[in-house]
């Protein structure tokens, strides 16, 4: 089946009353009158019909009903070449996109059209991008940990199954590699899949991610069905309508895997701030009065309509990892502040750790999780995590003294604390499966129980006599002894 998003039809078969024509174009915003009583519903997809009955060329989404059978719609692609008087067709449904296994290994735009030059998507399954959040009765309210196999995350800032995680990190600190490892691990440990939504970011970054996924095996070009991820891109150069809706397109694909295939799904949104930014642009184009700092008055509603659909149900779960850009590092800005209200955990990547060669460069002190409570994770996990944080915090406090006076000026207790902290810091590094082809080291998936055991043994002094190099880029604590003997 050839897929142009839900609009494969004979133009002649469309009811004449469902046709309108363009009377005004302001950038990506179109005004279209329809016959009396035939105005389309909010969020319906409209298609601008080109001259000479050629292919429909621009898809729009109804945003406002202006009265007198006139609607205002926002285009999902460039409006270059459109003119007043062009025919517009009401499809009668919201934008609908392909879903299911055939989406794996492919790249889509906001309309669900493949943009990877690998041919059409063979599927009859389409879902509208607008739908309600799951009803309360279908939600799974149990607080359970989503084990990632990544030591520093599982121990110090565990993810909630069906929760939302904010990923903070600048360029070059390992964000992409961490994302790919999470995609790989969920596929192996849970038989789950991932959906990546590129919202308003650089086209080059999207291309780099795709190439790296092919190199690491996350996308299998020979057998696309064995790929572990579907990609949906609405990049910086696209109109605000596309950037505002591409997150919903990715979420719709993820919901199918959760609700129909009953799988655990990872949904990546990079960047959630761009979703808000695009909504702000659309709001201004529609003539709404701006709210605080120029943002749209519907900011909380738009964010909630996206975030509330990301949840666990009795069928499966969607766990979302969202890159968060903080404008001017101002955490009180309405965009990040509204996002934080929905997050269960934060994973902060540290440039100083990356500079030391410690990967993943997750900052153990700045990363947080609402799940790290004794009644949720258990007393042993909580106690170990707190002791690790206290040790690392003390080491951080002593670093200025060490830089000026050296280790010899510290007390015996502080020297021991520093030695153990450096071993923990290195033990929390880990070789990744997706980096095997670059590093030559086989990847390691480490269970939470093994991580807790390893940190407990280091803190108890069991390995005080081993060099700290033995703890670098290993999996379980048992590998430390073997590595120390080889060295």
UniProtKB/Swiss-Prot annotation:
Catalyzed reaction equations: ATP + H2O + 4 H(+)(in) = ADP + phosphate + 5 H(+)(out)
The name on file for this protein is ATP synthase subunit beta, plastid
Instruction: List the signal peptide residues.
Output: none
Which protein family is it in?
Belongs to the ATPase alpha/beta chains family.
Q: What role is this protein assigned?
A: Produces ATP from ADP in the presence of a proton gradient across the membrane. The catalytic sites are hosted primarily by the beta subunits.
E.C. number(s) listed in UniProt = 7.1.2.2
Cellular location of this protein?
Plastid membrane
Q: How does it assemble?
A: F-type ATPases have 2 components, CF(1) - the catalytic core - and CF(0) - the membrane proton channel. CF(1) has five subunits: alpha(3), beta(3), gamma(1), delta(1), epsilon(1). CF(0) has four main subunits: a(1), b(1), b'(1) and c(9-12).
Sites binding ATP sit at: 169-176
Q: What are the record keywords, sorted?
A: ATP synthesis, ATP-binding, CF(1), Hydrogen ion transport, Ion transport, Membrane, Nucleotide-binding, Plastid, Translocase, Transport
Q: Which InterPro entries match?
A: AAA+_ATPase, ATP-synt_VA_C, ATP_synth_F1_bsu, ATPase_a/bsu_AS, ATPase_alpha/beta_chains, ATPase_F1/V1/A1_a/bsu_N, ATPase_F1/V1/A1_a/bsu_N_sf, ATPase_F1/V1/A1_a/bsu_nucl-bd
Q: Which gene encodes it?
A: atpB
Q: What Gene Ontology molecular function terms does this protein carry?
A: ATP binding; ATP hydrolysis activity; proton-transporting ATP synthase activity, rotational mechanism
Q: Which HAMAP family match?
A: ATP_synth_beta_bact
Q: Does the keyword Ribosomal protein apply?
A: no
Q: What is its main location?
A: plastid
Q: How does it sit in the membrane?
A: Peripheral membrane protein
Could you provide one GO biological process annotation from this protein's UniProt record?
A: proton motive force-driven mitochondrial ATP synthesis
Superkingdom in the source lineage:
Eukaryota
Query: GO cellular component annotations, sorted alphabetically?
Result: chloroplast thylakoid membrane; mitochondrion; proton-transporting ATP synthase complex
Q: Spell out the PROSITE patterns in the cross-references.
A: ATPASE_ALPHA_BETA (PS00152)
CDD domains noted in UniProt: ATP-synt_F1_beta_C, ATP-synt_F1_beta_N, F1-ATPase_beta_CD
User: Which Gene3D superfamilies does its entry note?
Assistant: 2.40.10.170, Bovine Mitochondrial F1-atpase, Atp Synthase Beta Chain, Chain D, domain 3, P-loop containing nucleotide triphosphate hydrolases
């Amino acid at each position: 089946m050839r897929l142009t998003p839900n609009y494969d039809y004979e133009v002649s078969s469309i009811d004449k009353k469902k046709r309108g024509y363009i009377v005004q174009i302001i950038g990506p915003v179109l005004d279209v009158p329809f016959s009396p009583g035939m105005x389309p519903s909010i969020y319906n997809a409209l298609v601008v019909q080109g001259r000479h009955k050629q292919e429909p060329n621009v898809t729009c989404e109804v945003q406002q009903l202006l009265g007198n059978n006139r609607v205002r719609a926002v285009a999902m692609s460039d409006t270059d070449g459109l003119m007043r008087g062009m025919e517009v067709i009401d499809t009668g449904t919201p934008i609908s996109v392909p879903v299911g296994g055939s989406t794996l290994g492919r790249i889509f735009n906001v309309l669900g059209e493949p943009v990877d030059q690998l041919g059409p998507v063979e599927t009859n399954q389409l879902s509208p991008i607008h739908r309600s959040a799951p009803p309360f009765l279908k939600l799974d309210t149990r607080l359970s940990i989503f084990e990632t196999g990544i030591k520093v995350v599982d121990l110090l800032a565990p993810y909630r199954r069906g929760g939302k995680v904010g990923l903070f990190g600048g360029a070059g600190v390992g964000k992409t590699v961490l994302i790919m490892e999470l995609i790989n691990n969920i596929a192996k440990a849970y038989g789950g899949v991932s959906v990546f939504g590129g919202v308003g970011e650089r086209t080059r970054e999207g291309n780099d991610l795709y190439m790296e996924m092919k190199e690491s095996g996350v996308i299998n070009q020979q057998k696309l069905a064995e790929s572990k991820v579907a990609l949906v891109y609405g990049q910086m150069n696209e109109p605000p309508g596309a950037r505002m809706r591409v997150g919903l397109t990715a979420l719709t694909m993820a919901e199918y895997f959760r609700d129909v295939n009953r799988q655990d799904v990872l949904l990546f949104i990079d960047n959630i701030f761009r979703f808000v930014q695009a909504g702000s642009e659309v709001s201004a184009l529609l003539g709404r009065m701006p709210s605080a700092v120029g943002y749209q008055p519907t900011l909380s509603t738009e964010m909630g309509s996206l975030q509330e659909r990301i949840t666990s149900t009795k069928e499966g779960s969607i766990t979302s990892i969202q890159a968060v850009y903080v404008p001017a590092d101002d955490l009180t800005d309405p965009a990040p502040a509204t996002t934080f209200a929905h997050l269960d955990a934060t994973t902060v990547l540290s440039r100083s750790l990356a500079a030391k060669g410690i990967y993943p460069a997750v900052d153990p002190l700045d990363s947080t999780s609402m799940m790290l409570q004794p009644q949720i994770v258990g007393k042993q996990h909580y106690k170990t995590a707190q002791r690790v944080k206290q040790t690392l915090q003390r080491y951080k406090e002593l670093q200025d003294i060490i830089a000026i006076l050296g280790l010899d000026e510290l007390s015996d207790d502080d020297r021991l604390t520093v030695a153990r902290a450096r071993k923990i810091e290195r033990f929390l590094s880990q070789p990744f499966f997706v980096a095997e082809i670059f590093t030559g080291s086989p990847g390691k998936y480490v269970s939470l129980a093994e991580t807790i055991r390893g940190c407990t043994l280091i803190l108890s002094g069991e390995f005080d006599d081993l060099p700290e190099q033995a703890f670098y880029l290993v999996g379980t604590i048992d590998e430390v002894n073997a590595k120390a003997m080889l060295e």
